[in-house]
Each structure stands twice: as C-alpha cells, then as structure tokens.
Curated annotation (Swiss-Prot):
Pfam entry (one): WD40
Coiled-coil ranges (or none): 55-80
GO BP, sorted A to Z: cell division; establishment of mitotic spindle orientation; microtubule organizing center organization; microtubule sliding; nuclear migration; vesicle transport along microtubule
UniProt cross-references to HAMAP family, sorted A to Z: lis1 (MF_03141)
Protein name: Lissencephaly-1 homolog
Keywords recorded for this protein, A-Z: Cell cycle, Cell division, Coiled coil, Cytoplasm, Cytoskeleton, Microtubule, Mitosis, Repeat, Transport, WD repeat
WD repeats: 104-143, 146-185, 188-227, 230-269, 294-333, 336-375, 378-410
Species the sequence originates in: Monosiga brevicollis
CDD domains recorded: WD40
Length: 410
C-alpha cells in the first residue's frame, strides 16, 4: 500500500515525536532536517501517535486472527453433522451483566452504532459530540466534533468506511472513517434533524426532521434529490429496507408510514399507536421465518409465506407494533414495557426482537409467540438506543445515565 503525501508527512512527524520523547534529540534533529519537517516538528498532537498507531495495528492483527479462527470454526460446524444440543445462532440473546460499560459524554446518549466489521462502536450525545470506542476493552478511541448542538442519530454505511450523523443544529454530516474528518455537510431541513441512514449502495443518505419531512440526498453532489411530505408532525425515525426500495418512518403524529424510494409516494399509513412513535425499523430477511410462524401459527409453504418486508415500531404508548408491507396488515402488538418504548433491534438469528425503554430495561421478544422471553435491567435511567453487531455476538445500549454498555449474546 502506497502512502499519500499527507500520510507520509504524518508518519514522519510521528516518528520524530517518538525520537524526541525517547531522548534521541540528535536523531530527531537530523530527521527533521532530512525530511524537511518544518514548523510542524514538535507539535504536541504528534506525541504518542506512533505508539497509538502501533497498538492499533497489533489489535487489528489480533482481531484478524480471531476472525480467521471464527471463520474456520464456522466452516467446521457447517461440515459437521447437526446436533440437537448445538446452540443455534437464532437462539442467542443478551446475557447480563454487561461486559463493558463506558462513560465519557457529558449529556444523555441519543444513539449508538456498531462498525459492520470491526469491534468498534460509536455513540452520539446531546453534548454535540460523537465518540468512538473499542467494544472489547471499552477504551476510548477519539471524538468527532463538528456539530454545534445535540447529535440525534448516527449510522455506518455497509462497509464501515463512512459514518453519517444528524443534529439539532439542522445539519447532516458525513465522516470519513479512515482519517476521521467531516467530508460533507448537508443543509436543507428547517428544524432539528432526528434520524439518518445510508441507502444500500452508500450513494445516498435519507434524513428525517422535526420539520415534518424526509429528504433524500445525493452524496456525490450534496444535493437534495427529493423531499417526502405527508406526516403532520415531527418525523422522529426512519429506516431503509435491505434492497433500498422502501423507507419506513415514525412520527409524533402517532403514525408509521412506508414510502417508495423510486416514486416518493406513501404506500401505507398505519395509525395503530395511541402516542408518539419513537422508532421504526425493517426486519432483516433472517427474521422472516419467525414472522411467518407468528402469522400462520406454523411454518407455511413457500407459496403462502409472506415475503414482507416487515416493519417494527416502538411508541410512547408502551407498545411495539409489527406490520407487513406487502399486505398492509397490522400483524401484532407487543406489550410488556412499563414506560415509553424508545427503540428496537433484531437479533442476528432473526428469532428475537430486542427493545429498550424508559422503564430502564432491555426486553427480548420471541416473535413467533409474541411473548417476552427475557427482561434485563439494563441501565439506571431511561434506555434511549440499541444496536446489534452484524457479524458477532454483541449488543450495545445507550442511556440517559450517560453510559454505553456492551452485552454478550450466547
């Protein structure tokens, strides 16, 4: 891999800082002269940078070895005969206590996101910052600063190369995860921007706002391609289907809507909640089997089974609703929380739906039976957000208690 000119300069400055710190002043001076480092040599921000990069490489090498071992284990499992006693992935649920608990934000946590490949998590807060953490050790990595008011939502693209954020400052920012710089700021909403997502290609960003609209942005140009209107109040949450064809939205107008990305038309409006709808998300394909078991009571034939997509919504009416986009049906209402339900996330195996609420708990719902299978006292205050790692066994929650917690599933 060839370093860019800027990367070469940063490496030279980091080596220079290391030599100075190690007491090799003559070698440092000779290097500064040879490399023509100029006034940047001696800048305090480069002190310790070489050691940090070295430990990061070591950690990534270790993680790479672990992933290779996991792949080999999965291959061996695939070749081995199935056993009745083998714990299947669809049965994995979070187990207390949390394996990691970090704090560093000065105000409540509003959103969490997990890197799709690495053991890195991001947290957003009302303190206007985004922080990156090592999920396994809990070590703080860095802060992303640029917003001037509360950061309300964050999301990685599919590869984890970029992070998108939105804020009460009415802007959306796109961050490069290689150098942790803001590469694009999108402006156009007239009020708080409450939710953001990349599309499946990473070429577009979708945003929802208190100005009652949803916007579709082209990242290459920064232009707003389309504005979707229909909600009569604050649009609090959006999600994009896996194929990029649909958007679902949740609003303070008590409705959940599904929109066609191609046409911008609203396909369904569900008014089944009795209070503000805080969150809406699409079920992954792996959850369709459990959802069809719930619909039919037993496994349906391939022809009869609903192909979805399916939507889950969380509301201040203390309930979670499930919807079928293909039929427009309201499938079920899940009740059990004792306070506002803030967010949901699907288990990797698809059998369970996880939810967090102002009753300070995380609950695990068996979708096929529509019952709570586990209640976990998660935080000491309202639990505001949840995310599930796409490739390993971690669940992350964030809270008004200023803590981000990592939970192991088994």
């Amino acid at each position: 891999m060839v370093l860019t000119a800027r990367q070469q300069e940063e490496l030279q400055l980091a080596v220079h800082a290391y030599l100075v710190e190690a007491g090799h002043a003559e070698a440092a001076a000779a290097m500064a002269k040879s490399a023509n480092l100029g006034d940047d040599a001696g800048d305090a921000k480069y002190t310790g940078l070489l050691e940090k990069k070295w430990t990061t490489i070591t950690r990534l090498q270790k993680r790479n070895m672990e992933l290779q071992a996991e792949v080999e284990e999965l291959r061996s499992s695939a070749r081995a005969p199935r056993s009745r006693t083998t714990t299947k992935m669809e049965e994995w649920v979070p187990r207390p206590p949390a394996t990691v608990a970090v704090d560093g934000h000065r105000l409540p946590i509003t959103a969490v996101a997990i890197h799709p490949s690495f053991a890195v998590m991001a947290s957003a807060s009302e303190d206007a910052s985004i922080k990156l953490w090592d999920m396994e050790s809990g070590n703080f990595e860095r802060s992303l600063k640029g917003h001037t008011n509360a950061v309300n939502d964050i999301a990685y693209d599919r590869e984890g190369n970029r992070l998108v954020s939105c804020s009460t400052d009415m802007t959306i920012k796109v961050w490069n995860m290689d150098n942790f710089t803001c590469t694009k700021t999108l402006s156009g909403h007239d009020h708080t921007v409450s939710s953001v997502r990349f599309d499946h290609t990473g070429d577009r960003v979708f945003s929802a706002s208190r100005d009652k609209t949803i916007k579709i942005w082209e990242l290459a140009t920064g232009y707003c391609l389309q504005t979707l209107q229909g909600h009569s109040d604050w649009v609090r949450s959006i999600d994009v289907s896996a194929d990029g064809a649909w958007i679902c939205s949740a609003s303070s107008d008590h409705t959940v809507r599904v929109w066609s990305v191609a046409s911008g038309e609203c396909k369904h409006v569900w008014s089944d909640h009795e209070h503000v709808v805080e969150h809406a998300s699409f079920a992954p394909l792996v959850a369709h089997e459990a959802l069809n078991l719930m619909i039919f009571g037993s496994k349906p034939s391939a022809e009869a089974a609903s192909k979805g997509p399916f939507v889950a919504s969380a509301s201040r009416d203390k309930s979670i609703c499930l919807f079928d986009v293909s039929t427009g049906q309201h499938l079920a209402r899940l009740t059990g929380h004792d306070n506002w339900v803030r967010a949901t996330a699907w288990s990797r195996g698809g059998r369970y739906l996880f939810s967090v609420a102002d009753d300070k708990t995380m609950r695990v719902w068996d979708i096929a039976t529509k019952r709570v299978s586990k209640t976990i006292p998660a935080h000491n205050h309202f639990v505001s957000c949840i995310a599930v790692h796409a490739k390993n066994t971690h669940v992350v929650t964030g809270s008004v208690d200023l803590k981000v917690k990592v939970w192991e599933c088994n």
